[in-house]
């Protein structure tokens, strides 16, 4: 079910429900655009109701680091960023996963909890800016794909 005030996503568009009528639902996006959603869309499209099970949501940001990086330092920095961010919740506490030994990087995922799904894009962007800044301050490189070419004579 959808109620006024819910944050929903349908067909890739996210909005806060403002009004529900017999034929349409009106929602407003984070950039203040009005979505008019025909109610039949709920039957033919996948609907995500971000507030259906409460207001606590989980999000994540992934980042890769150079293979020469101290992985414990990466974990410490990522947790510090999450702990100090004003829009992230302290409980449940943020977590860092060492996801993979990637082709070009050691891959990590910062998982966090927030209570305003309407700000998710801004929160994730803000965290990425902070990761870039903190990694730069600590001389941690975010690698890019590289290839070694061996030439035979």
Where are these regions (language model features)?
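Soluble accessory domains appended to multi-pass membrane transport proteins
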Residues: 1-90
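Solvent-exposed, non-transmembrane regulatory segments of membrane-associated proteins
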Residues: 49-50, 65-69, 79, 83, ...
């Amino acid at each position: 079910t959808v109620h006024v005030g819910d944050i929903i996503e349908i067909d890739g568009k996210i909005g806060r429900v403002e009004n529900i009528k017999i034929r349409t639902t009106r929602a407003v996006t984070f950039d203040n655009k009005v979505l008019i959603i025909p109610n039949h869309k709920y039957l033919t499209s996948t609907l995500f109701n971000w507030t259906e099970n409460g207001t606590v949501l989980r999000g994540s940001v992934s980042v890769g680091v150079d293979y020469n990086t101290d992985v414990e330092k990466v974990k410490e920095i990522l947790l510090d960023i999450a702990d100090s961010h004003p829009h992230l919740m302290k409980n449940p506490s943020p977590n860092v996963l060492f996801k993979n030994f990637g082709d070009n990087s050691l891959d990590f995922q910062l998982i966090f909890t927030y209570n305003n799904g309407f700000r998710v894009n801004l929160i994730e962007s803000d965290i990425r800016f902070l990761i870039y800044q903190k990694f730069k301050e600590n001389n941690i490189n975010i690698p890019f794909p590289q290839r070694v070419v061996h030439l035979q004579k």
